[in-house]
């Protein structure tokens, strides 16, 4: 959701209708906010109020589970949050859903969890496409189309075009196969250095 210099991206896991309800209320909560602090507080308050409201309807122990990851950018500043139920925490990296273990592993391996410096926006999009591809390939229950949103502080925010996501995914599938072969080749001490270098060069050329 975008409005001038204010943008919100939100995804969720768990009880679908409840996630949709919070998502539909998130943008309304941001109306009239002036800065990132007001925006952050507004969405957090909305989440807590929604849980309080529906908590009076559901029987004890039957309340639907939902996890949210959302980002906000306004006035040249941005923040990322993760909400586990009504508990909201600010994050530099977050994952959720049944594929989050695989996502965390791949993000750490590719330096995308913020612990070893920061990636460029293009690199983050590539990592996101790769994680989604791997999750859909290897985690039961993960599927559907891949959707990637980018929030920018100095430029326009929005969704990455579906065609680009598909192109990235196909390219990463090919690169992933060759990367696996290279890992095996580097452990093959019978292969000469020149042969290994040639294999690496041909793979990079792809």
Where is each model-derived feature located?
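Conserved short S/T/G-enriched processing/targeting/catalytic segments and their helical context
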Residues: 1-64, 87-126, 140, 159-206
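Short beta-strand scaffold segments in enzyme catalytic cores
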Residues: 66-73, 79-80, 124, 144-153, ...
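A mid-sequence, solvent-exposed acidic-amphipathic segment
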Residues: 71-97
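A conserved acidic, glycine/proline-rich C-terminal tail/linker
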Residues: 127-133
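Short arginine-rich
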Residues: 133-140
């Amino acid at each position: 959701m975008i409005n001038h210099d204010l943008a919100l991206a939100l995804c969720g896991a768990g009880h679908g209708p409840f996630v949709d309800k919070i998502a539909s209320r998130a943008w309304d909560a941001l109306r009239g906010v002036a800065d990132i602090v007001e925006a952050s507080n507004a969405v957090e308050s909305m989440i807590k109020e929604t849980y309080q409201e529906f908590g009076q309807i559901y029987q004890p122990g039957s309340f639907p589970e939902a996890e949210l990851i959302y980002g906000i950018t306004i006035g040249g500043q941005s923040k990322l949050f993760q909400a586990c139920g009504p508990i909201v925490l600010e994050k530099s990296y977050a994952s959720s859903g049944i594929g989050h273990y695989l996502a965390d592993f791949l993000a750490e391996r590719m330096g995308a969890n913020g612990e070893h410096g920061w990636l460029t926006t293009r690199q983050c999009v590539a990592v996101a496409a790769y994680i989604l591809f791997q999750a859909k390939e290897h985690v039961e229950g993960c599927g559907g189309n891949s959707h990637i949103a980018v929030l920018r502080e100095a430029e326009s925010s929005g969704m990455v075009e579906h065609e680009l996501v598909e192109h990235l995914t196909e390219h990463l599938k090919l690169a992933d196969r060759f990367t696996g072969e290279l890992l095996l080749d580097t452990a093959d001490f019978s292969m000469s250095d020149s042969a290994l270098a040639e294999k690496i060069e041909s793979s990079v050329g792809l």
